[in-house]
Amino acid sequence: MLTKFLSLLLLLLLLGCAFCNSDGSQSLHMLQISYFPDPYHGRHQGNASLGKLLTHTLEGPSNNVTILQLQDWQDPDSWARTESGLKIYLSQFNSLVQLIYRERKNDVVFPLTVSCSVGCELPPEEGSEPHVFFDVAVNGSAFVSFQPKTAIWVTGSQEPSEAINFTLKQLNTYNRTRYELQEFLQDTCVQYLENHITTQNTKGSQTGRSYTSLVLGILMGCFIIAGVAVGIFLCTGGRRC
């Protein structure tokens, strides 16, 4: 079940997260939120920015999401494919919630809100280590978080539950959710930021293309983990599977 579940979420995505600057450093900070008042209705919200430049927005119910590209970094045909792929993903995401509800109706708790925060930051001074992070929250409470130095997922709650322990066991089993994520955050994301500082004023079009690739890669992992949190929480009702 989990293998099929993860495979379903390995779709090419572009939106759903927020990138922003922190004081004194160059950073990428991403946030994606999905809200389900009941099994049959979902609403998604997200945006993407590079530095202080807002590049994409996403908002709306699962069956009528509005997705906008604010910067012309993808040609119309390419953007149409990206937009279509994301809408298909969101539709399948909503269908997955309904499926789990049908299977475990007595254990599902609504409303349900899942948020996924992931990013990397360059320090204001040379010689300091970059800061990278990946945190998942369910219904406003810390659920799990990623420790990049050890490539281990840990509980984000003061009181670990069987649901959280089960989730951690699954996340710490797969190379994709451990070492591939570690490499992407510590290497790919950080290197992109370093290169962006150098090239942002001289190679605008190239920056746009590399930024698109970066977002695609990060968000694949972003939605995988957010999806795992949704699936486990719905399956357990916050208690046990």
From Swiss-Prot:
Stretches assigned to coiled coil: none
Signal peptide: 1-20
Entry keyword Signal: yes
Known glycosylation sites: N47, N64, N139, N165, N175
One annotated Gene Ontology cellular component of this protein: perinuclear region of cytoplasm
InterPro entries according to UniProt: Endothetial_C_recpt, MHC_I-like_Ag-recog, MHC_I-like_Ag-recog_sf, MHC_I/II-like_Ag-recog
Regions that span the bilayer: 214-234
Membrane topology, Extracellular segments: 21-213
Keyword annotations from UniProtKB, A to Z: Blood coagulation, Glycoprotein, Hemostasis, Membrane, Receptor, Signal, Transmembrane, Transmembrane helix
GO biological process: blood coagulation; negative regulation of coagulation
Location within or outside the cell: Membrane
Membrane topology: Single-pass type I membrane protein
Sequence ranges on the Cytoplasmic membrane side: 235-241
GO MF entry, a single one: signaling receptor activity
One Pfam family cited in the UniProt record for this chain: MHC_I_3
Protein purpose: Binds activated protein C. Enhances protein C activation by the thrombin-thrombomodulin complex; plays a role in the protein C pathway controlling blood coagulation.
Protein name (database record): Endothelial protein C receptor
Organism this protein belongs to: Rattus norvegicus (Rat)
Gene designation per UniProt: Procr
